Swiss-Prot record:
Stretches assigned to coiled coil: none
One matching Pfam family: Ppnp
EC number(s) on file: 2.4.2.1, 2.4.2.2
A GO CC annotation given for this chain: cytosol
Record bears the keyword Protein biosynthesis: no
GO MF, one example: purine-nucleoside phosphorylase activity
Organism: Acinetobacter baumannii (strain ATCC 17978 / DSM 105126 / CIP 53.77 / LMG 1025 / NCDC KC755 / 5377)
Name the record gives this protein: Pyrimidine/purine nucleoside phosphorylase
Superkingdom assignment: Bacteria
Keyword annotations from UniProtKB, A to Z: Glycosyltransferase, Transferase
Family under the similarity heading: Belongs to the nucleoside phosphorylase PpnP family.
UniProt cross-references to CDD domains, sorted A to Z: cupin_PpnP-like
Keyword Glycosyltransferase: yes
Gene: ppnP
């Protein structure tokens, strides 16, 4: 089971706001220089498309979502406690019918 908190971190106060507020996150920096973002995605009528620059592991904390990675024709369902991986320099589409809490682990 994963931890419910991060210790010994720096939180960047300014939020990252995407898609007119449908996705809001904050960046967390660790002592070793690694970063994660903690965020919320609100329900939308259409999937949200994100571009990655570094590999990302998206950990779902609460809610559920449907995700298409890169050129996949199939969406996959992810629920709280699950994660999905997106390669660097790629795209993914995500949609949810409920509030989705996530941690994005920036792995590059």
């Amino acid at each position: 089971m994963s931890s419910t908190q991060f210790d010994h971190v720096t939180v960047i106060k300014k939020s990252n706001v995407y898609f007119g507020g449908a996705c809001i996150s904050h960046t967390v920096q660790f002592e070793d220089g690694t970063k994660k973002t903690l965020g919320v995605i609100l329900p939308t009528e259409q999937p949200l498309t994100f571009e990655t620059h570094v590999p990302e592991r998206m950990e779902i904390i609460s809610g559920e979502c449907r995700v298409k990675i890169a050129d996949s024709n199939e969406s996959e369902l992810f629920r709280a406690g699950q994660s999905f991986y997106v390669p660097g320099n790629s795209v993914f589409k995500i949609e949810t019918d409920e509030v989705l809490d996530y941690v994005c682990h920036l792995e590059g």
